[in-house]
């Protein structure tokens, strides 16, 4: 059984017991979270596709950890000006473990 959920502007294909990193959520570690934006639920041959979401479908998860991703390096270079600007960015994420698909 798997489902497709939407969180943080992205879509994820999830199964029970799976761990994944999503955009930062305001839930403390060890807390439970419920995803209501379920776009698709598949249980064997029974496939339910939402328009835009599946009515009554919910995916529950447990927050494992919060953290920051790898650094993305940015370089702005101005030709012939002897000028450049180096910057970096590390995006916050929340690691969740899927506990149930209903």
Curated annotation (Swiss-Prot):
It holds the Pfam family Ribosomal_L21p. GO terms for molecular function: rRNA binding; structural constituent of ribosome. One of its GO terms (biological process) is translation. PROSITE patterns: RIBOSOMAL_L21. InterPro entries: bL21-like, bL21-like_sf, Ribosomal_bL21, Ribosomal_bL21_CS. Belongs to the bacterial ribosomal protein bL21 family. Part of the 50S ribosomal subunit. Contacts protein L20. This protein binds to 23S rRNA in the presence of protein L20. This is Large ribosomal subunit protein bL21. It comes from Marinomonas sp. (strain MWYL1).
């Amino acid at each position: 059984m798997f489902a497709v959920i939407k969180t943080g502007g992205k879509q994820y294909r999830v199964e029970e017991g799976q761990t994944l990193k999503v955009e930062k959520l305001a839930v403390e570690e060890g807390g439970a979270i419920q995803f209501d934006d379920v776009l698709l639920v598949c249980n064997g041959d029974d496939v339910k596709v939402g328009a835009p979401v599946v009515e009554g479908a919910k995916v529950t998860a447990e927050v494992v950890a919060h953290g920051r991703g790898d650094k993305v390096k940015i370089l702005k270079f101005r030709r012939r000006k002897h000028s450049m600007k180096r910057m970096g960015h590390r995006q916050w994420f929340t690691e969740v473990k899927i506990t149930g698909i209903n």
